[in-house]
Amino acid sequence: GPSTDLVIGNKGFDGGIDSAILR
């Protein structure tokens, strides 16, 4: 997704914490 991951610091699929879990 367009949101930046808060943990990894890269573009996430969902954004925020959710992205970190998916990655």
From Swiss-Prot:
It is found in: Secreted. Binds 4 Cu cations per monomer. Optimum temperature is 60 degrees Celsius. Shows 50% of its maximal activity at 20 degrees Celsius. Has a half-life of 53 minutes at 50 degrees Celsius, 23 minutes at 60 degrees Celsius, and less than 2 minutes at 70 degrees Celsius. Its EC number is 1.10.3.2. One of its GO terms (molecular function) is hydroquinone:oxygen oxidoreductase activity. One of its GO terms (cellular component) is extracellular region. Keywords: Copper, Lignin degradation, Metal-binding, Oxidoreductase, Secreted. It catalyses: 4 hydroquinone + O2 = 4 benzosemiquinone + 2 H2O. Its cofactor is Cu cation. GO terms for biological process: lignin catabolic process. Belongs to the multicopper oxidase family. On the 2D-gel the determined pI of this protein is: 4, its MW is: 64 kDa. Lignin degradation and detoxification of lignin-derived products. Demethylates eucalyptus hard wood lignin. Has high activity against the non-phenolic heterocyclic compound ABTS, and lower activity against the phenolic substrates syringic acid, caffeic acid, syringaldazine, vanillic acid, catechol and levodihydroxyphenylalanine. This is Laccase-1. It comes from Galerina sp.
